[in-house]
Amino acid sequence: MIIKEHPEDFRVEERIDLVWDLEPGPFRLYTLEKRSWNTTDAFQAAARATGIPWGVIRYGGKKDRQACTVQYGTTPAAFDLSFQRHNVRVTPVGFAPTPMGPRHVKGNKFDVVMRRVEKGHGELLGQRWEEMERHGELNYFDDQRFGGVSSSGAFFAEFVVRKDFSGALRHHMTSHHPEASPAIRRRKRSMDRMWGDWRALRSLAVTPEEREMVGCCLANPGERGILEALGLLSRETWGLYLSSFQSALWNEALALMVRRSSEPLWSLRGKVTSLPFFRHKGTEGAWRSLEIPMPSSELSRSDDEGSRAVGEVLKRHGLKPEDFILTPSFRAHFSSFSRSAVVVPQEGTWGLSDDDRHRGYDKGRVSFFLPAGSYATLILRSLQHSIPGPSSDGPGPG
């Protein structure tokens, strides 16, 4: 079975609650339609082409590169970000009283084609989909959330909460994307070996940010320079790093509670840890109303079941809620909110037909809406588990 064989097989449409109309207002609202582009690159291309400062563009979230997606963004009304290029189009649709942001995203509607489904397996997928529509699925954060974790499993934010600021800066400056070129990998390895020798590192710093960070450490040796360098990180980067670590701890808390149940379990392999799921209908009852807080300095103010589970996870890591209070110079903070333990797909449809690209196979088509913050990829991975063999991650230890 294949998902995302072509971008058209994975369509995402963002839904927002930002009030807007056609009458002129403070902010111009746009749709961004893209295929095989990531969100940031698409908006930046439009900004360069129109001469609009990148800093005035606001949007709700990043959408998958390997997909066909529609989402929203804003600029101040004085600008016009209209833009079209191969596989990307920015179109003005009206005006809004406030800029677009993550808080305005209600969720996303997904339309997904699963190809090369063996004959007979489509019925299993359909049965599993019906179960998920009735009972929901555990609402773990999926692997996309953990882009800030290194190959060793270390999190930037964990260094920060442990007050190892040199380790945090080292993580940021020496980590690289899994698809980075061999030249970048070699340069990052050299930076890691020379860490602390700021004069040597100056010759390896090639981006403006790297040069500025090394400059801080040269001008102010010791912790002061390192704190100044960390203060150069953008709010977006801080947000990604902090939410990544919080989400990993949240997943651990939910997994801890699931493993303590009496239900039979199976598991999915995650980038950070193994994620246990109920084999049958364990998401019924109290699980449907369970809220688990994100780890933060506010945790100690609650004593519900979810808070206790997060507290136990923090204790296992040798951390306390007050560790999540950050140095003011970072201009960043850990968000404090609760997340549902179970997500139920809405507006679902399921269909099965002959695969027009793979003779002798079926294709499944599933459409559904998920609230903001929930992961269609996790729903699809769980759906695949109904198929025996390589397409399933298989049962894991309970």
Feature-to-residue mapping (PLM):
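Extended, charged/glycine-rich binding lobes that contact polyanionic ligands
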Residues: 1-22, 27, 35-36, 49-50, ...
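Acidic, low-complexity intrinsically disordered tails
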Residues: 395-398
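Ser/Thr-Pro-rich, acidic low-complexity intrinsically disordered regions of eukaryotic RNA-binding
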Residues: 39-45, 376, 380
